[in-house]
């Protein structure tokens, strides 16, 4: 529901101030959910999950909203360019890595592993998914004024912002894509190690 606030056609019509206000209200709703005061039926489902799985933490949910704010023009967290992989990692963690932290308490772990052990692979899966999304949507994002590919990587392979915006797919761009695809694959490998850590019924 929060993703639609910043990435739906309606969001573009309503503008960044409305996006920011809606996300602020979502943080308030989360606070109420965590003290068992849900606003509607969907909130009630999350509130019930929190009651049944007490190890659920509110922090990943708030972090995800911060990730949405990174896509909200005018907000102090907003970024439409990323200088380094470390900067982009923060974005990937917030919008996707957090999902692993949200679902792990519900999925549970095997008797031979702890939740803490399963967290790194869970995070890696979210990071891998988000890198994949970024690589899939390079052209679409560029049309919306966003370039998520780290500038340090683009510079390393001789790829310019103008080239990204114009959709020039030369050898430099292809080599950049190979580099980023390998990064995603490395995270998928790290994530795969977490599968045996999950509870069998998961």
Can you describe what each PLM-predicted range is?
Residues 1-196:
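Acidic catalytic motifs of isoprenoid enzymes
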